[in-house]
């Protein structure tokens, strides 16, 4: 007998439909699986055989052939266990084949017949809903994550025996209800450190506000103890809330990486990733035998904070260049090409020299050559992609001893950030541009118009500082953001001067 079961595999953060075909015929007793399979998929044969035996169902002494199509797609992972088991049971006549139509099945099977959770359920169920499948069968532990998708029925299963009884109407499949799985995505904002806790550093705070308002990359340079890390960790408090579309993209990435839990099945807040400087290029960009998202993809629609930037290996930092330009990570493997979104805001911090105290000659003992060698760890092409560089100085004593100084809270700053972003959304309505930092060079003259007086001012700055074309464009984008924060439709000279 012959049967077909629908399942899927995740490549990048998108789902690819897969058909599991099972054929049970007379012949030599053999259990064979074909279809461009990885080792873990081939191992499903023994897991399914043992699980069925422990559930009271022995495979017949016949030839069993399993084909996973299309054959040109490399299949990997353990999510094929349950669809293979169901396909075999249907071919044996234990499960009615008509119940498998328009049903997508995923799940790993343990030797005792338990259904174990898998990674990437959210993109799989999302694709199934788009393809207008009637229902999806997923492990119970993935049900809350899968239930975020509307327009499709869900069956949560615990054991293989439960699956068999459910298909034969001996029991009813468990369907998570809306109020159980929490379709409500509005959650209380997580407590983060507040900008009001920082005394002094008004110039750096202003730079952070500008950077967040226009999604500009930011580099802070200063001595140890100046507050670079402290300030960076408060940036999440002034980020605007994600839209539902953005949150769904981020949740898909975390689903593929296996970072979602039953208590946190929806990424409601913008990510803040802070990898250590010893991270490998693969850890930053993503990779592995089955390529998965790295830190720069986990920071999608959020902040990637690189502390001690000059301590990262040069080859690791150079990986950032392409994702910062194209806002996605592209990995080429023998099994195919993988693409992960990585539209993040880079915030970096570093010391001006190896000891950290340059140019304070009383404390810095580095030679000029040592300072230059230290700064050369950051390549010029990478620096060209950072819009704002700001110096953090040692906090003055008078700022430290002020009693209850009035400092702006993160909530107050966030209101101005949201207002500036709303102006950008109105300006870029109907285009694929979302932030001032994303304005293409060809459109700068349209969105960043300058008067004759301002052009003369910028010409003098261009010649005096020997700017490159890319640096000039960066100044215009930052000035456009400052003007938005000022509520001005036109870029004024003071905006250019601050930029």
Where are these regions (language model features)?
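Walker A/P-loop
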Residues: 220-260, 326
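Basic, amphipathic alpha-helical bundle interface domains used for macromolecular binding and assembly
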Residues: 37-45, 60, 67-77, 291, ...
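Walker B catalytic acidic pair
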Residues: 301, 307-308, 319
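P-loop NTPase nucleotide-binding/switch module
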Residues: 171-210, 214, 241-296
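Peripheral, non-AAA+ core regions of ATP-driven protein-machinery
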Residues: 1-219, 223-229, 332, 471-472, ...
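Short beta-strand elements
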Residues: 18-24, 284, 387-391
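Catalytic P-loop NTPase motifs of RecA-like helicase/translocase cores
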Residues: 112, 306-313, 356
């Amino acid at each position: 007998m012959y049967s077909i079961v629908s399942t899927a595999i995740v490549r990048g953060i998108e789902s690819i439909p897969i058909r599991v075909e099972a054929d049970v015929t007379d012949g030599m007793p053999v259990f064979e699986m074909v279809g461009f399979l990885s080792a873990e998929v081939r191992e499903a044969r023994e897991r399914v055989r043992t699980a069925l035996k422990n559930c009271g169902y022995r495979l017949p002494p016949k030839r069993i052939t399993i084909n996973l199509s299309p054959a040109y797609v490399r299949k990997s992972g353990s999510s094929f266990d349950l669809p293979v088991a169901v396909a075999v049971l249907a071919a044996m006549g234990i499960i009615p084949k008509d119940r498998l139509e328009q049903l997508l099945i995923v799940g790993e099977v343990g030797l005792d017949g338990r259904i174990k959770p898998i990674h990437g359920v959210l993109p799989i169920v999302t694709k199934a809903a788009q393809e207008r499948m009637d229902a999806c069968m997923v492990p119970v532990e993935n049900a809350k994550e899968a239930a975020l998708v509307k327009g499709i029925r869900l069956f949560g299963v615990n054991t293989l025996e439960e699956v068999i009884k459910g298909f034969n109407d001996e029991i009813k499949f468990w369907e998570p209800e809306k109020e159980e799985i929490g379709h409500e995505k509005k959650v209380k904002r997580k407590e983060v450190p507040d900008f009001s806790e920082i005394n002094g550093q008004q110039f750096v705070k202003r730079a952070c506000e500008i950077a967040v308002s226009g999604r500009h990359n930011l580099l802070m340079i200063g001595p140890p103890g100046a507050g670079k890390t402290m300030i960076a960790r408060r940036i999440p408090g002034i980020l605007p809330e994600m839209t539902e579309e953005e949150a769904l993209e981020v949740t898909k990435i975390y689903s593929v990486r296996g970072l979602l839990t039953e208590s946190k099945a929806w990424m409601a807040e913008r990510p803040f990733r802070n990898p250590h400087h010893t991270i490998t290029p693969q850890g930053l960009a993503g990779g592995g035998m089955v390529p998965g998202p790295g830190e720069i993809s986990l920071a999608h629609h959020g902040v990637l904070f690189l502390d001690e930037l000059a301590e990262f290996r040069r080859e690791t930092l150079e990986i950032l260049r392409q994702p910062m330009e194209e806002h996605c990570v592209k990995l080429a493997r023998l099994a195919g090409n993988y693409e992960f979104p990585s539209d993040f805001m880079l915030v970096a911090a570093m010391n001006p020299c190896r000891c950290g105290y340059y140019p304070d000659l009383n404390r810095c003992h580095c030679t000029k050559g040592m300072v230059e060698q230290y700064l050369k760890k950051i390549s010029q092409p990478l620096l060209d992609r950072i819009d704002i560089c700001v110096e953090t100085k040692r906090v003055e004593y008078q700022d430290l001893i002020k009693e209850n100084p009035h400092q702006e809270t993160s909530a107050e700053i966030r209101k101005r950030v949201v207002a500036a972003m709303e102006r950008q959304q109105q300006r870029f309505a109907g285009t694929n541009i979302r932030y001032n930092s994303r304005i293409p060079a060809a459109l700068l003259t349209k969105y960043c118009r300058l008067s004759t007086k301002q052009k003369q001012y910028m010409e003098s700055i261009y010649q005096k500082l020997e700017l490159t074309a890319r640096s000039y464009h960066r100044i215009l984008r930052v000035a456009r953001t400052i003007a938005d924060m000022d509520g001005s439709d036109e870029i004024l000279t003071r905006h250019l001067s601050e930029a």
